[in-house]
Amino acid sequence: MNRIAIFLGIILLFVLLAGGVYFFVLRDTSGTPNNNPSFGSGGSPITIPEDDNIDFVVDDTPIQEKTILTQIHEAPVAGVIVRTNEIEVTVGSTTESVRTPVVQYVDKQTGHVFSYDPEENTAERTSNTTFPGIQDVHWFNDPSKVVFRYVNGDGEIETYLGDLAGGSLNGSYLDVDLPAVQTFNDSLLSVHTTERGSEGFISDNEGRGESLSFESNLLSILVPSFAESFAAVLTKPVSTLAGALYFYENGSQKRILGGINGLTALPNEAGEFVVFSESSDRSYTSALYDRGDDEIKALPLAVLPEKCVWGDETTLYCMVPEIIPPANYPEHWYQGYISFTDSLWRINAALGTARAIAFFDESGPFDGINLSVDEDEDYLTFINRRDGTLWGFDL
């Protein structure tokens, strides 16, 4: 009997030790983001809801049955833009102008700038000046001008206006710790923190000719877009706080959207349409605001504006998550606790249509951000947030 008791006692001891090892060593209680989180059966597939309030015509048959993606850059990329170049092509005695897309992008680790030709599938390094750890990139119409944003060794945000010339990057620094910058054509909008809130200043692509664009009593803001006639200012989105979107036009402030938890938004260039998302019940919903009709139209797809890009004034391209895991949106996605698996869709804000372009079952998974499309809407790029790689897609 004593031997049996001793044997059972030893087994119990091993069970307790194993439990202790799991609880104190193997169980992750650090609160750090999990790059590949598992939510079990908590997520639900994205379906097209049968809702009388959603006045959209939806076609989920992909335009391209066979999806051909090109991995443009294997290392993480900090920023990308697709431009349209015009070149002269001569065939026999006839010369004509041909428009072709070209992709500019920045390697995140080195800060080197590259130019990629989709038709030739070749990339050329246009700057070998090293800027390690670039976090954010903004572009101008002038392809030789660029804005780099990164955190220096003292934890300060540096903003650098660069000029690409002769294979190197030269330029100048703006003030440290600017909370936000945005570009439009060849103008730069830089946001400064003041005792009263925030101020926005417009300058040229070299930081000259600065003039006041707006004054706000808001401290924590983003600038999702900036155009010739307005600057869009968004309160930083938090799922538990009501956010607002303001337009600053001709010196006046107009509240476009407000009282929306976790509000994140992206206006088109004219400011006529705004795609936005709202946090609710550990998920989110999406809608379009038609400023001309002062009408909000619920979208049949759960899109985050950070995963979209406007083509023309009414056409929106979005990487749409196929499953929405339960979480606090958008911050849990920002912080890396959540990764999505996306498909590519096109939404027409004026016609009220949504059409699937491609599903990436064989090539993915992709959690697409930093979408860019050329003027002719022939070529689209996105960065896969899962690993930072850059991908191109022929529309």
Locate the predicted segments by residue.
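Sequence signature of WD/YWTD-type beta-propeller architectures
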Residues: N2-L395
